[in-house]
């Protein structure tokens, strides 16, 4: 299979699977964090509290993506980090993280 010369190679990630540290800088609890706390819900009691530590290592991650020659990156935001109480009061530190 051949790709056109203008094909854009990229990568994508999910906030819960990569960021870790959900309560850092005032972040709230997501549905996944609550689910993972339920006994027996997840094998071995695993959770995303550290994940890939993208919260602290995002600059290194960006360098790695660039070194792979990727020209696009799609990431998701953690609404629990942006609106920790689910009441529309934005967490400025959460917004700054994604800016």
Identify the residue ranges that each predicted region occupies.
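Non-catalytic accessory regions flanking glycosidase/transglycosidase catalytic cores in CAZymes
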Residues: 1-99
């Amino acid at each position: 299979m051949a790709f056109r010369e203008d094909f854009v190679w990229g990568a994508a990630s999910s906030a819960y699977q990569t960021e870790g540290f959900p309560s850092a800088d005032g972040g709230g609890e997501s549905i996944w964090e609550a689910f993972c706390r339920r006994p027996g819900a997840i094998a071995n009691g695993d959770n995303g509290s550290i994940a890939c530590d993208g919260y602290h290592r995002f600059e290194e991650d960006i360098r790695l993506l660039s070194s792979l020659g990727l020209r696009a990156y799609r990431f998701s935001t953690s609404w629990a980090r942006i609106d920790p109480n689910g009441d529309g009061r934005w967490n400025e530190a959460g917004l700054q993280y994604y800016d």
